[in-house]
Amino acid sequence: MRHTEEKRLAWALTGSGHYLRECLDIINQLQDVDLFLSKAAAEILQQYGYRHSVGRVFQDKTASSVPVELFYAGRYHTLVVAPATSNTVAKMVAGISDNLVTNLYAQAGKTRVASIVFACDTEPELESEAPRDNIVKVYPRRIDLENMEKLKTFEETTVAGDMLQLHSAIQDRLACLKISSS
């Protein structure tokens, strides 16, 4: 197993445009981060015309989600899933790991790697960015809100309800790692 200072942060993007620009801003400010893209995330990045400056990017191109083996190698100290679609959150809650992002979450849990999840559907009414800079009103379903609440009870998982909470959770985690490695 590697030492904490050599470990990296794994960031997984799903197919949501909700606060995607802001998530990319955070990603672009971080050091030692690897980016994992679901198939839908790769499409959404192109559709929205967003760019990132991450050097190591893994895409969902294999049936067995080969990149998850990096968690077994002790390569990561933290997994961030942001933004996380209601579909991704539902699969996490149900223990379904049938794509790259849900597999990463499952393997992070099995290897005791802390996860931070920014769920898109956190309030009964939201404004969200759609392609071409359109803002739309979104009304998450009761099941989406319930799944987000259930995810909050999972071990080694922090659920952020907004961008401030996401940024704070990441900074708190990095500070904790820095203290524990000193």
PLM feature spans:
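A cross-family phosphate/adenosyl-ligand binding-site feature
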Residues: 1-182
